[in-house]
A protein has these predicted regions:
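Short, solvent-exposed amphipathic alpha-helical segments in soluble enzyme
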Residues: 6, 64-68, 148-149
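Hydrophobic faces of well-ordered beta-strands that scaffold small-molecule active sites
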Residues: 9-13, 42-49, 129-133
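Generic C-terminus detector
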Residues: 123-166
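Residue-level preference for long, well-ordered alpha-helices that form the structural scaffold
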Residues: 18, 104, 111, 139, ...
Length: 166
């Protein structure tokens, strides 16, 4: 619809396994785009799910909350996102581990350099440099730290120093 109306298109790459089809969706948007009074060329935005931390181990620890939440949702359980301390203490079956490995292929997780490399790879795959980031984790400070690390590694001009303004 966005292509037919000549509007910008935003793709949520972070829902389930949508990233498997995202590049095709982006290609179809560009192929069927019709210029409008609003937009002369197609404009695509992609939102990626990212957790960035100082170490790979810490990023995986932070992501454990999200992982348990994903497993619970498969069982019809809807609880608030638990802490990573609680989540990492839960036993995971081999089947659940296999499921998490599959869905986590679509999450960018790691150190600043790893995250930067994967974000840049996604911009090439989608053919856009217009990227949003979704970070689903228990602690606000972990989310904020993730955003700050990403901003630093991309050398963005302004990083909020006074967290009380957020």
């Amino acid at each position: 619809l966005a292509a037919a109306l000549g509007l910008p298109f935003s793709f949520a790459d972070f829902f389930g396994t949508t990233s498997e089809h995202g590049p095709l969706v982006a290609e179809l948007y560009r192929e069927y785009f019709r210029p409008s009074g609003y937009l002369k060329q197609p404009r695509l935005n992609v939102t990626l799910q990212v957790i960035c931390a100082e170490t790979q181990k810490k990023a995986e620890f932070i992501a454990s909350s999200r992982n348990i939440s994903r497993l619970e949702s498969l069982k019809g359980i809807r609880n608030p996102l638990m802490s990573p301390e609680e989540a990492s203490s839960i036993e995971i079956t081999p089947y659940e581990l296999k499921y998490l490995e599959k869905v986590n292929k679509h999450v960018i997780l790691g150190t600043p350099n790893v995250v930067k490399e994967k974000i840049l790879e996604a911009t090439k795959i989608y053919g856009t440099d217009d990227v949003n980031i979704a970070t689903n984790c228990h602690y606000f400070d972990d989310r904020l730290n993730s955003f700050e690390l990403i901003a630093e590694t991309f050398d963005l001009s302004k990083i909020v120093e006074d967290r009380s303004q957020i």
